[in-house]
């Protein structure tokens, strides 16, 4: 089946096409990728998508799935974490545990200004409505990730986004181009049940806060515990938005934007 999917893709060649031409080319490949297992998709991507590869992780509730899936096929793949300085203590502990147990090649990136310095300059941005949250995300998520991809010369970026996580992710393809790099989502069609079975099969753990009722975990000040009647996306950013900015197109063409 893998042989039926297109051979090595040259990023520069695809970027020379119009958006419409890119969409047609990628759509043909995605039809084939949808028929493969997550493990087969990863194997195909590592073999056929040119350039350096990396996986981003927030070390959230189900993070162990992608980290295990990728590191088992490429042990030294860089794992990019953008550390805001406001993660839960349990998240930092989870990072240490997974880094040790999976022998991860962890690469930590942070904002140019420390958390305290940002508060001194801008106040608590997360309390300043959607504009404040977007500025906070740009400083602490988008710019550090942009820097990581540039410094590591990443051409293929793996992520664990899944369609059922939110309405904004419902139509995501497995393979796309985002701001000049390949974006590859091998578990995009997985359900929560699929995730659970994978974790159980491989002896992996959920984030520690899962047991306390958290469905999604980010920063302490913009993460809420799930309550009856809430959707998963309503547990983040006060329900104002789902994405932190990392997975949104910013229309840059040089591959630096996230």
Curated annotation (Swiss-Prot):
Catalyzes the formation of sulfite from phosphoadenosine 5'-phosphosulfate (PAPS) using thioredoxin as an electron donor. It is an enzyme of class 1 (oxidoreductase). Belongs to the PAPS reductase family. CysH subfamily. One of its GO terms (biological process) is sulfate assimilation, phosphoadenylyl sulfate reduction by phosphoadenylyl-sulfate reductase (thioredoxin). Keywords: Cytoplasm, Oxidoreductase. Its main location: cytoplasm. GO terms for cellular component: cytoplasm. InterPro entries: PAPS/APS_Rdtase, PAPS_reduct_dom, PAPS_reductase_CysH, Rossmann-like_a/b/a_fold. Its EC number is 1.8.4.8. It is found in: Cytoplasm. Pathway: Sulfur metabolism; hydrogen sulfide biosynthesis; sulfite from sulfate: step 3/3. Disulfide bonds: none annotated. GO terms for molecular function: phosphoadenylyl-sulfate reductase (thioredoxin) activity. It catalyses: [thioredoxin]-disulfide + sulfite + adenosine 3',5'-bisphosphate + 2 H(+) = [thioredoxin]-dithiol + 3'-phosphoadenylyl sulfate. The active site is at residue 244. It holds the Pfam family PAPS_reduct. The gene is cysH. This is Phosphoadenosine 5'-phosphosulfate reductase.
């Amino acid at each position: 089946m893998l042989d039926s999917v297109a051979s090595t893709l040259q990023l520069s060649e695809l970027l020379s096409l119009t958006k419409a031409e890119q969409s047609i080319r990628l759509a043909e490949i995605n039809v084939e990728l949808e028929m493969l297992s997550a493990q087969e998709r990863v194997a195909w991507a590592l073999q056929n998508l040119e350039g350096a590869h990396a996986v981003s992780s927030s070390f959230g509730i189900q993070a162990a799935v992608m980290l295990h899936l990728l590191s088992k096929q490429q042990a030294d793949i860089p794992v990019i974490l953008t550390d805001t300085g406001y993660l839960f203590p349990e998240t930092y502990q989870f990072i240490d545990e997974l880094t040790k147990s999976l022998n991860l090649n962890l690469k930590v990136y942070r904002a140019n200004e420390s958390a305290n310095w940002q508060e001194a300059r801008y106040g608590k941005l997360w309390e300043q409505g959607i504009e404040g949250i977007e500025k906070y995300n740009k400083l602490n998520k988008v710019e550090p990730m942009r820097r990581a991809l540039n410094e590591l010369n990443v051409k293929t970026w793996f992520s664990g986004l899944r369609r059922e996580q939110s309405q904004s992710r419902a139509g995501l393809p497995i393979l796309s181009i985002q701001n000049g790099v390949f974006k590859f989502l091998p578990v995009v069609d997985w359900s929560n049940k699929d995730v659970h079975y994978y974790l159980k099969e491989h002896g992996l753990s959920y984030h520690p806060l899962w047991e306390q009722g958290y469905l999604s975990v980010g920063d302490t000040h913009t993460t809420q515990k799930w309550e009856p009647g809430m959707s998963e996306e309503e547990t983040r950013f006060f329900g104002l938005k789902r994405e932190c900015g990392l997975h949104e197109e910013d229309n840059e063409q040089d591959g630096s934007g996230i």
